[in-house]
């Protein structure tokens, strides 16, 4: 490993040296050109200019040679990666590890997921990537050629995007590898890692990652399969356990929190305002109905979404107000729920101060319940005497109430998670041997075709009917298949037998050596070459 690292360092040095030499020569050439342009025609000057051009050409040739040499060094250093396969990793933070103030800086809007994936996969040691960004979490899933280098590149990307120093980010990030990363995603999809244990909306968000990745072509085979298996795990947990029964969602917890903060005698008469008619907003309306609320004002950019909610939910009066009337609507509300995709606050301290006071019957305080990330309501609004702000981090108070029962159900769900994890790991293990299987079949078929041609030439074309020729070809194919059956059986790693991955990989290495297939190094070299060439363009 040390030798390989040295090789890579030497390669980097070759690049740097070539660039330095090329830069110096180019600068010299430019100076000569300026002298010549100035009208000095002495032979000495002309000779020096010619010499400068020649030196520049030589420097370019040296730089090109250095690039080739560096690429060869990178090829040699492929041994660094051959000791272990590419790693699946998740790097992220959630409501459990970081405050909303940090999460909102890292939040990636759904329409920007494809661009984020493109930026991540352009990093030198990242092959595949996916982004899961919700109000409670921001997680990046990658397949990394090198664990340490890949993690460092992703953390640097997150730091650059958010403006948060990498050292500060690391205090709140969690990093999981391979089966731990996969299990985490399966638990997320099943609602086991949610602030609200068992909530259902996260499964829809995991599905959206797959749809978004497929539409943009950004998901590789490992990440794509992992997310699809996570969806399967999430569905099974909800169908085969009762974890979702009675489980609250972020939206229902927001409604519950608001009612907890209102005087009990005035809960049903409180004037409710919802800003944002998206998925979360729709769920707020649904849970207001469940609590007996008869009227809600909904502010939204367009009326179509509000009409759709009104059409679906007949048990409540829904009044539409356009976005331009948001502050007027807030002035008439006792409770303001916010759930929009705005990246800047809709309500600041100045806005809250301008709103009229609330009646003493309602506690004299206007409640802002903000379930958006980034936040729609500035924290400083709470500094206003007649206003209180609650965000998603404040929902824990509600969640704790019925947590024990769902924790027991979560234990049942872990059995399903483990089953789905084993299926995914078996599938991924099987990928290790696919290149060897293909190479071995191709190698055997080339020999078969060559020997068959020699045989047919000896017999003579005229001596064979079409049926006889076809029979001979089928015979040769059958012999090859019979001979390959045993070796290929020992390359199986799909979880259907007791053979371990180490045993299978040992068989694969043996076949690579015996038949000079050399598939591993060729694949790694190809990946590294593509990365190097991409970085040079």
UniProtKB/Swiss-Prot annotation:
Catalytic site positions: 135 (nucleophile)
Origin organism lineage: Eukaryota, Viridiplantae, Streptophyta, Embryophyta, Tracheophyta
SUPFAM superfamilies, sorted: Glutamyl tRNA-reductase catalytic, N-terminal domain, Glutamyl tRNA-reductase dimerization domain, NAD(P)-binding Rossmann-fold domains
Protein name in UniProt: Glutamyl-tRNA reductase, chloroplastic
Pfam annotation, one family: Shikimate_DH
Pathway in which this enzyme or protein is active: Porphyrin-containing compound metabolism; protoporphyrin-IX biosynthesis; 5-aminolevulinate from L-glutamyl-tRNA(Glu): step 1/2
The species this protein was found in: Oryza sativa subsp. japonica
Reactions listed under catalytic activity: (S)-4-amino-5-oxopentanoate + tRNA(Glu) + NADP(+) = L-glutamyl-tRNA(Glu) + NADPH + H(+)
Family: Belongs to the glutamyl-tRNA reductase family.
Chain sites annotated for binding NADP(+): 276-281
EC nos: 1.2.1.70
GO molecular function: glutamyl-tRNA reductase activity; NADP binding
Entry keyword annotation includes Chloroplast: yes
Role of this protein: Catalyzes the NADPH-dependent reduction of glutamyl-tRNA(Glu) to glutamate 1-semialdehyde (GSA).
Gene Ontology annotations for the cellular component aspect, listed alphabetically: chloroplast
Residues flagged as site, Important for activity: 184
Keyword Chloroplast: yes
Subcellular location: Plastid, Chloroplast
Chain residues that bind substrate: 134-137, 194, 199-201, 205
Transit peptide feature range: 1-48
Keywords assigned by UniProt, alphabetized: Chlorophyll biosynthesis, Chloroplast, NADP, Oxidoreductase, Plastid, Porphyrin biosynthesis, Transit peptide
Misc. remarks from the entry: During catalysis, the active site Cys acts as a nucleophile attacking the alpha-carbonyl group of tRNA-bound glutamate with the formation of a thioester intermediate between enzyme and glutamate, and the concomitant release of tRNA(Glu). The thioester intermediate is finally reduced by direct hydride transfer from NADPH, to form the product GSA.
GO biological process: chlorophyll biosynthetic process; protoporphyrinogen IX biosynthetic process
CDD domains the record matches: NAD_bind_Glutamyl_tRNA_reduct (cd05213)
């Amino acid at each position: 490993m040390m030798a390989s690292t040295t090789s890579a360092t030497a390669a980097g040095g070759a690049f740097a040296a070539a660039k330095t030499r090329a830069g110096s020569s180019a600068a010299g050439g430019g100076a000569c050109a300026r002298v010549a342009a100035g009208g000095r025609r002495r032979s000495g000057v002309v000779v020096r200019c010619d010499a400068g051009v020649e030196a520049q050409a030589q420097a370019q040739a040296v730089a090109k040679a250095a690039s080739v040499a560096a690429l060869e060094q990178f090829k040699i250093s492929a041994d660094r990666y051959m000791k272990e396969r590419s790693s699946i990793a998740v790097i992220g933070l959630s409501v459990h590890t970081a405050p909303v103030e940090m999460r909102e800086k890292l939040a990636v809007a759904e329409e920007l997921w494809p661009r984020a994936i493109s930026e991540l996969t352009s990093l030198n040691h990242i092959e595949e990537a996916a982004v899961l960004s919700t109000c409670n979490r921001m997680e990046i899933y990658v397949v990394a050629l090198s664990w340490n280098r890949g993690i460092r590149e992703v953390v640097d990307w997150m730091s650059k995007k958010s403006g948060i120093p990498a050292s500060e980010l690391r205090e709140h990030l969690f990093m999981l590898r391979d089966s731990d990363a996969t299990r985490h995603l399966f638990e997320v999809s099943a609602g086991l890692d949610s602030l609200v244990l068992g909530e259902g909306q996260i499964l829809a968000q995991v599905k959206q990652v797959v749809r978004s990745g497929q539409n943009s072509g950004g998901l590789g085979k490992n990440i794509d399969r992992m997310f699809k298996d996570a969806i399967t795990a999430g569905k099974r947990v909800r169908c085969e356990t009762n974890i979702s029964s009675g489980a609250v969602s972020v939206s229902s917890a927001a409604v519950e929190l608001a009612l907890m903060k209102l005087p009990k005698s005035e809960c049903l008469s409180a004037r409710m305002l919802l800003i944002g008619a998206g998925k979360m907003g729709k769920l707020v309306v649904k849970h207001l109905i469940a609590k007996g609320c008869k009227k809600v004002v909904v502010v939204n950019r367009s009326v179509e979404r509000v009409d759709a909610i009104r059409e679906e939910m007949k048990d409540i009066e829904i009044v539409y107000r356009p976005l331009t009337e948001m502050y007027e609507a807030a002035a008439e509300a006792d409770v303001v729920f916010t759930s929009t995709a705005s990246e800047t606050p809709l309500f600041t301290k100045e806005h809250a101060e301008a709103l009229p006071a609330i009646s003493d019957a309602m506690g004299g305080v206007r409640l802002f319940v903000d379930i958006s990330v980034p936040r729609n309501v500035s924290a400083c609004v709470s500094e206003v005497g007649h206003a209180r702000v609650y965000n998603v981090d404040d929902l824990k108070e509600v969640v704790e109430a019925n947590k024990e029962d769902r924790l027991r159900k979560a234990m049942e769900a872990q059995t399903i998670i483990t089953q789905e994890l084993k299926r995914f790991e078996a599938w991924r293990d099987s990928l290790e041997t696919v290149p060897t299987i293909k190479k071995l079949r191709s190698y055997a078929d080339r020999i078969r075709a060559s020997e068959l041609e020699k045989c047919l030439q000896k017999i003579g074309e005229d001596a064979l009917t079409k049926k006889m020729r076809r029979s001979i070809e089928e015979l040769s194919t059958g012999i090859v298949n019979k001979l390959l059956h045993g070796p290929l059986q020992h390359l199986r790693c799909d979880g259907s037998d007791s053979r371990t991955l180490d045993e299978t990989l040992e068989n694969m290495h043996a076949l690579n050596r015996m038949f000079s297939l050399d598939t591993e190094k060729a694949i790694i070299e190809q990946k590294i070459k593509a990365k190097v060439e991409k970085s040079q363009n």
